[in-house]
């Protein structure tokens, strides 16, 4: 569960390393975001010479959360860290590589480009 002021690692090669959530999209009173949800975030840490600069406001989709999530078959999925992938306005990833596994929920929410770039889908 990601909320305002949550910090997430960036799981792609855009140049950003850490982002801070400033808004959960999907309704005026929506408080939490899970795997496959879109957030607005600001870049808190970036590598020098990257495409993304510190302080930039970006949109991102969450790919991993430490809070367990129950699936329709009764199983639970959780990860060791909170991570997100930066996206363009048309919901395609801004980077060309994805690092680490991503949740299967991304396939159900039509983020097929991220699913195809990911090394593992859990």
UniProtKB/Swiss-Prot annotation:
Keywords: Ribonucleoprotein, Ribosomal protein, RNA-binding, rRNA-binding. GO terms for molecular function: large ribosomal subunit rRNA binding; structural constituent of ribosome. The keyword Zinc does not apply. Part of the 50S ribosomal subunit. Forms a cluster with proteins L3 and L19. In the 70S ribosome, L14 and L19 interact and together make contacts with the 16S rRNA in bridges B5 and B8. It comes from the Bacteria. This is Large ribosomal subunit protein uL14. It comes from Rhodococcus opacus (strain B4). Binds to 23S rRNA. Forms part of two intersubunit bridges in the 70S ribosome. The gene is rplN. Belongs to the universal ribosomal protein uL14 family. Coiled coil: none annotated. GO terms for cellular component: cytosolic large ribosomal subunit. One of its GO terms (biological process) is translation. InterPro entries: Ribosomal_uL14 (IPR000218), Ribosomal_uL14_bac-type (IPR005745), Ribosomal_uL14_CS (IPR019972), Ribosomal_uL14_sf (IPR036853). HAMAP family: Ribosomal_uL14. The keyword RNA-binding applies. Pfam families: Ribosomal_L14.
């Amino acid at each position: 569960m990601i909320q305002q002021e949550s910090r997430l690692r960036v799981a792609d090669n855009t140049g950003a390393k850490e982002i801070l959530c400033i808004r959960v999209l999907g309704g005026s009173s929506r408080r939490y975001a899970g795997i496959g949800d879109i957030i607005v975030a600001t870049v808190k840490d970036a590598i020098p010479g990257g495409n993304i600069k510190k302080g930039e406001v970006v949109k991102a989709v969450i790919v991993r959360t430490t809070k367990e999530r129950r699936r329709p078959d009764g199983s639970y999925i959780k990860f060791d860290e909170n991570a997100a992938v930066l996206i363009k306005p048309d919901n395609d990833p801004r980077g060309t590589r994805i690092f680490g596994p991503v949740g299967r929920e991304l396939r159900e929410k039509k983020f097929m480009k991220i699913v195809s770039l990911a090394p593992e889908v859990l």
